[in-house]
């Protein structure tokens, strides 16, 4: 379907009904327009405390992974997620359990998963703590320990480090082999607003 957002890049591929014929049509269209798709993006909360929402998100993520293989992209960008009722340690344990079968499926199709570092705490339903725990090098290390897969890496977005007042260059050295995809966009820090409400 067509997205409701009013900026570019959000009209979606219907992964639920994608088959090899439709995938080939998309690839031919991209070739004709001289563009490539770097990744399929899907950003749900697969650690949601609502187990029905969690299952729905995981089921669709599996379809996105399959579509990425059909389209010969072999990369999906997403969030690890967060259960807002749990602390970070318990969320890490939950992530290990929830993501293991997702990664096994991705590996079976030769599709890599790149986790974005956006905290997702911008709206009332995302507060407090946001909907994604994978926001910092300290947490990445723990995730990669619990999920030691060559198919799990990062969709690195330096803008989220900037507004959190973190060094966005330093992680590039330690995690260079885990950076599968990069989001580039501009950012402006509103210092007056930050002085009023802080970075969280």
Language model features with spans:
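Flexible loop residues that form catalytic
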Residues: 1-3, 45, 81, 118, ...
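N-terminal pre-domain/capping segments
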Residues: 1-74, 89-100, 107, 145, ...
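Acidic/histidine-rich catalytic cores of soluble enzymes
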Residues: 40, 90, 96-200
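Substrate-binding cleft and catalytic face of glycoside hydrolase catalytic domains
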Residues: 38-48, 77-85, 111, 120-122
């Amino acid at each position: 379907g067509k997205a409701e957002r009013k900026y570019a890049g959000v009209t979606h591929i219907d992964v639920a009904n994608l088959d090899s014929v439709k995938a080939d049509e998309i690839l031919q269209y991209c070739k004709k327009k001289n563009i490539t798709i770097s990744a399929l993006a899907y950003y749900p909360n697969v650690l949601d405390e609502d187990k029905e929402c969690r299952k729905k998100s995981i089921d669709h993520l599996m379809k996105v992974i399959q579509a990425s293989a059909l389209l010969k992209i072999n990369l999906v960008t997403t969030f690890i997620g967060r259960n807002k009722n749990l602390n970070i340690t318990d969320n890490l344990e939950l992530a290990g359990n929830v993501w293991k079968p997702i990664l096994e499926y991705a590996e079976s199709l030769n599709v890599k998963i790149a986790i974005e570092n956006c905290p997702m705490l911008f709206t009332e339903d995302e507060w407090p703590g946001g909907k994604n725990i994978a926001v910092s090098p300290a947490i990445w290390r723990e995730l990669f320990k619990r999920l030691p897969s060559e198919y799990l890496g990062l969709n690195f977005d330096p803008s989220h480090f900037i507004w959190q007042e973190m060094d966005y260059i330093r992680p590039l050295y330690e995690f260079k082999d885990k950076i599968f995809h990069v989001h580039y966009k501009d950012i402006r820090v509103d210092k007056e607003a930050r002085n009023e409400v802080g970075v969280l």
